[in-house]
Amino acid sequence: MRSLSRLAIAISLASSPMAWAEHSSAIDDLLEAARQEPAITVYDSTGKIIEQAEAFSKKYGLKAEGVKSKAPHTLERIIREAQAGNIQTDVAILADAPAAAAQLLDTGFAYNWFPDELVDTISERYRDPLAIVMAPNVWTYNTALHDTCPIGNIWELTEPEWTRRVTMQDPLGKPSYVDWFNQMAQHGDEAMAAAYEAHYGHPLANEESATSAWVKALAANAPLLTDSDSNAAEAVASPDQQDSFIGLTSTAKFRDNANGMTLGICEDLDPWLGWTYPSIGLIASGTQSPNAAKLFLYYLLTEEGIAPQAQDGKISTRSDIALPASEPSGIGALKAQLFDYSPGTAIDDWENRQDWQDLWMLNYRR
């Protein structure tokens, strides 16, 4: 198992299943060992990591610095530090599971760690690599123009009625989107085919995967592509928008409803109203603070630790931690309608990224 082999790289805390039997004892042991170690630096693509690192430092009396950094920059930093033998990054939270697996785990530049005491609350699918949160991306509509979502099936987005009226980030510049395509093909193709038959009354009449057929048809329907979630959300639900669009955005954009936006989630969309994408927590091989790094990952897996990101609709991988009632999108009550990413097949996503990008590029029409 990859996590166990890499755990031996830099472990100073003796661990066994019994070591995690008591919450307080396990955490006290980690904390005691961490007090003998240097301060840690943690990189994440969300600015909330700064707040989380400060709260961690205050709670445990340790020094941790949070740095906002996009996944490609963090990956490059860890790789260069490992190659130079000069480790400055201790923990990385990466919203790019395939790259994390291929460029850091499989090279030994970072390693996976999972706290055994959480085995009853974190599904096996989220343990190796360790997924801290799942970020929902949802199909949205303008609640000022429609009482309910104007579509009921994802295949409707490929039809003439919605030509140039679907908006989303450009998959050629957003790797998570093509990873989503590959995940659907690997784990959700039967559901995509069933949705096609439910909508049109007959099976899909070709031998290719239903997912690839949908991707090609969506690309050919001239969607409005943007370079950010914000632009996609504005196209759907800005205060002055008079045209009806369906958009794919993160749940974080629902914060803007407080400032006049009118985003709504397409509930009960067949087969899914959206999908999730993980943030993977890894420890840099060669860190001088392995115990503090583990304690920080554990902290992010607590309700207190993940609270700042939960406000944006990011869902803890712990089954016993719910989103706060104040989260603006309401996605917590709709989790069962999301297509859930499988981190265990992230390498397959990495290997097929170019193929899905090529498929999109060849079929896209403006």
Predicted regions, residues:
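Bacterial N-terminal signal peptides
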Residues: R6-S16
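Conserved C-terminal helix/tail region of periplasmic/extracytoplasmic solute-binding proteins
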Residues: H23, D340-R366
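Short, polar/charged alpha-helical segment
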Residues: A26-R35, Y43-K63
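Paired acidic/hydrophobic, glycine-rich loop segments that form the ligand-binding mouth/hinge
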Residues: V42, G85-L94, L225, Q242-S250, ...
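Extracytoplasmic ligand-binding site segments that recognize negatively charged/polar headgroups
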Residues: Y43-E54, V67-I79, I87-A237
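A ligand-binding cleft/hinge motif common to bilobed small-molecule-binding domains
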Residues: P98-Q103, A237, Q242-G264
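Periplasmic-binding protein-like
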Residues: T121, M134-N137, S209-L218, G260-S285
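Mature extracytoplasmic/periplasmic domains
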Residues: W275, S279-G344
